[in-house]
Amino acid sequence: MTIVEDAKKGIITEEMKIVAKDEGLDPEFIRRGIAAGRIVIPTSPYRQVKLCGLGEGLRTKINASIGVSSDIVDDEMEVKKAIAAEKAGADTLMELGTGGDFLGIRKKVIDSISLSVGSVPLYQAFIEAARKYGSIVHMTEDELFKATEDQAKLGTNFMAIHTGVNNITLDRLKAHGRYGGLCSRGGAFMSAWMMHNEKENPLYSQFDYLVEILKEHEVVLSTGNGMRAGATHDATDRAQIQELIINTELGQRAHDAGLQVIIEGPGHIPLDQIETNVKIMKEMSGHKPFYMLGPLATDIAPGYDHIVTAIGASLSASYGCDFLCYVTPAEHLALPNIEDVITGVKTSKIAAHIGDMVKYPERARQWDLDMGRARRDLDWEKMYSLALDPEHARAVRNSRAPEDSDACTMCGNFCALKIVNQNYNLAK
């Protein structure tokens, strides 16, 4: 039985107990959430993973994406990025390589970390077709499903699968047009294949077969967002919403069949449309876990897109988004390096916490309360221990060490907190 089938029968599994303990919640809450499709726990029959719950009532989680490109193929660098992402605090990792030895690189990454690892199987299928036949459009349907199964057997335990890119969404896209084009690589691959071959997307037309494969290997289905906007001016357009309708319908079919399901959301959205996107998705999907790619709230800041994402992600989390894909400073410019990965994870973790302060104030705000008291008391060791990145906080202060060990060089002898502490008590 799958974990969904266990949950529907009232069985509380060991995985549910572990996630409940990590979240400070009752295991029955987790079981009910999985049974209803509101919570997922990526697991794998092929490897031990650090369990992580995603969904309503749980802390907002962060995914870090890595992977070689056709220009830069460095297996060991990707392994180092994966290790750095886990150390920096990522909750999951996606290996999205588009070059080199697909399964070989992914196996090295999977073996190097304890996190759940996700993938996009159609990347492998299309790129191997290009290598073999000279073009992605010559990929066969059997090759697509074989790539999916091969990656599942390797221990990949959640997959972004572009089920909603079908003839209906493609017609909507062509009729409506885009200012920023189509930025989803999976969406671009599949739509090109469909138009050349004049055929329906096999991930849609053979969806039940896809579910069988994923169910056999206990893989979480993340419905890929192939029609997402690549520019804020295209956000929430007809193609995006049409794909969302299809994905939420297919997501329910998959859950009814015993599969865990995540619904992917868009990546470029102006702030005034974020609430709309989250609420529409939650209502249409029956409140399944919502995974947003960023999101980026403006398009004008290449080199600083991790900051742009933090703004959009914090608002998204506050409205109910459950799962955020990080964005690094290299987004739209280059393949990220190790430092970019670390910065992306840290920035998105800050955004997730800010969102959780609104979404779950009783749980999330205690951390900030403790930090406020430590600052009031000028307890530097306590401040370091509470910091999101204790090593960085300590290093910054020590790099500009104050004469007065109670203060910092921002205020020096005129530290407001020290003056107040010397003259009256504001303890609370």
UniProtKB/Swiss-Prot annotation:
Organism encoding this protein: Methanosarcina mazei (strain ATCC BAA-159 / DSM 3647 / Goe1 / Go1 / JCM 11833 / OCM 88) (Methanosarcina frisia)
Binding site for substrate: M94, Y123, H162, S184, R185, G186, N225, G226, M227, R228, E264, Y291
Recorded family membership: Belongs to the ThiC family.
Protein name as it appears in the record: Phosphomethylpyrimidine synthase 2
PANTHER family for this protein: PHOSPHOMETHYLPYRIMIDINE SYNTHASE, CHLOROPLASTIC, THIAMINE BIOSYNTHESIS PROTEIN THIC
Pfam entry (one): ThiC_Rad_SAM
Signal peptide annotation: none
Classification via Gene3D superfamilies: 6.10.250.620, Radical SAM ThiC family, central domain
Catalytic activity, as annotated: 5-amino-1-(5-phospho-beta-D-ribosyl)imidazole + S-adenosyl-L-methionine = 4-amino-2-methyl-5-(phosphooxymethyl)pyrimidine + CO + 5'-deoxyadenosine + formate + L-methionine + 3 H(+)
